């Protein structure tokens, strides 16, 4: 039976500071690193051991993956880094304090930007301090100026179809270390969650979510490993 492990990166510095992060590259905090290592230890203790790994091009997800694999005794597994697993791009909100943004624009407007399915935040200005167009990791990639959750799903699902799903069908136990919104995309697809309901799904940092799938990759069971 194919098995998929999803893990959101451990707490990042901007999670701690309550800032919009998106594609900007911030590191995990000491707490975030501990969350990642604890997740890997849980994988080892429960015997849920990945044989193949996928992650984004962002440090917080990559480091979470490595710490979890180290704790699980699985640093040797092959990993694939794919930009399509990056967090949703928060456009012109990138770097802003969430509370200050709400005070400036109003709670309802910020809620629409954060939690609507298909309304993106204002675009990031070209040449701003958070413009990643010249970042070497994105050579050949059209870096978005902003994204809605719908936009994020539209890039995550081809990664699923091209890479992750074939690996599961081939018998791999796959771990995906990614971000709140890129993981929402996978959960929505696998669990058949509606556009409206997926926006309210919270995915905690550093907590492995396990999918037991049938041979057609339909969900048999979904659970937090810590609850088993």
Swiss-Prot record:
Catalyzed reactions: (2R)-2-phosphoglycerate = (2R)-3-phosphoglycerate
Site positions for Transition state stabilizer: 179
Entry's family note: Belongs to the phosphoglycerate mutase family. BPG-dependent PGAM subfamily.
Record flagged with keyword Repressor: no
PANTHER family: PHOSPHOGLYCERATE MUTASE (PTHR11931)
Annotated NCBIfam families: pgm_1, PRK14115.1
Keywords, in A-Z order: Gluconeogenesis, Glycolysis, Isomerase
Gene behind this protein: gpmA
GO MF: phosphoglycerate mutase activity
Name of protein: 2,3-bisphosphoglycerate-dependent phosphoglycerate mutase
EC code(s) of this entry: 5.4.2.11
Residues reported in the UniProt entry to bind substrate: 8-15, 21-22, 60, 87-90, 98, 114-115, 180-181
Pathway linked to the protein: Carbohydrate degradation; glycolysis; pyruvate from D-glyceraldehyde 3-phosphate: step 3/5
Organism in which the protein naturally occurs: Novosphingobium aromaticivorans (strain ATCC 700278 / DSM 12444 / CCUG 56034 / CIP 105152 / NBRC 16084 / F199)
Assembly: Homodimer.
GO BP annotation list: gluconeogenesis; glycolytic process
